[in-house]
Amino acid sequence: MGRFPSWVLVADWPAPPGVMVLSTLRGGPGVSVAPFDRLNLGNCSGVAGDAPVCVERNRSRLVEMLGLPSVPHWLRQVHGVEVLRVDALLQSIARVVEPTADAAVTSVVGAVLAILTADCLPVVLAAVDGSEIGVVHAGWRGLADDVLGRTVAALRTSPEYLQAWLGPAAGPQAYEVGVDVYAAFVERDSGAACAFSVTRPGHWYVDLYALARQRLMRAGLSAVSIYGGGLCTISDPQRFFSHRRDRRSGRFATLAWIGC
């Protein structure tokens, strides 16, 4: 993994054999201008506000400069719980429209899965033998609706043989939320209260990493098989895009694939 450039963050975990996982940083060799500078990778629909032609050029540069085995499977993310399975047929056909989903799984060698974020939590799942992977866009809505549990269930590997990596996201000392977010978790599960710390009446800091660990463990993963966390997108403007911090912001990608 040492072959990757400085504008790439390689996952800090004991990677299963053949599994590659990384997140891009905003300072990569992109063409987007402020406030999307420079390597903004989404969305081509213009949702993030950047010119679609810039996003397309950035995505092309990403594939070329990282030497990716194939064009990533970009998703139309909607803060939902839909999981896309990338099989050999889907990998082989041209991708004209981004499928609507907030997670993807595959066992196809060389298929590159991608998640776009700018404060939401990107999560990568992998079988310990490297036979299967999944990626998840886990914002607070998705976490509350258990997108992680649904993705674990979509994988063919038994949960005790899975491991997870939590990528850069809004940190627990920077991401303040209101009653709606607090209630979405605590009214369903009182144990989620430990992931919230009061900042002022009716407001809390929320620990997305803690909530993700709770849900992954509930889905059957062991605590020792969950890695990452601790990189705050809001407090690190040099490296990460942040919607909460900047409002108009680009998106960085978390990519995963099974190497040949």
Swiss-Prot record:
The keyword Transferase applies. CDD domains: YfiH. Its EC number is 2.4.2.1, 3.5.4.4, 2.4.2.28. Pfam families: Cu-oxidase_4. Zn(2+) binds at residues 79, 120, 137. InterPro entries: Cu_polyphenol_OxRdtase, Cu_polyphenol_OxRdtase_sf, Cytotoxic_necrot_fac-like_cat. GO terms for molecular function: adenosine deaminase activity; copper ion binding; oxidoreductase activity; S-methyl-5-thioadenosine phosphorylase activity. It catalyses: adenosine + phosphate = alpha-D-ribose 1-phosphate + adenine; S-methyl-5'-thioadenosine + phosphate = 5-(methylsulfanyl)-alpha-D-ribose 1-phosphate + adenine; inosine + phosphate = alpha-D-ribose 1-phosphate + hypoxanthine; adenosine + H2O + H(+) = inosine + NH4(+). Keywords: Copper, Hydrolase, Metal-binding, Oxidoreductase, Transferase, Zinc. It comes from the Bacteria. SUPFAM superfamilies: CNF1/YfiH-like putative cysteine hydrolases. The keyword Hydrolase applies. Its cofactor is Cu(2+); Zn(2+). Homodimer. Belongs to the purine nucleoside phosphorylase YfiH/LACC1 family. NCBIfam families: peptidoglycan editing factor PgeF (TIGR00726). Purine nucleoside enzyme that catalyzes the phosphorolysis of adenosine and inosine nucleosides, yielding D-ribose 1-phosphate and the respective free bases, adenine and hypoxanthine. Also catalyzes the phosphorolysis of S-methyl-5'-thioadenosine into adenine and S-methyl-5-thio-alpha-D-ribose 1-phosphate. Also has adenosine deaminase activity. This is Purine nucleoside phosphorylase XF_0940.
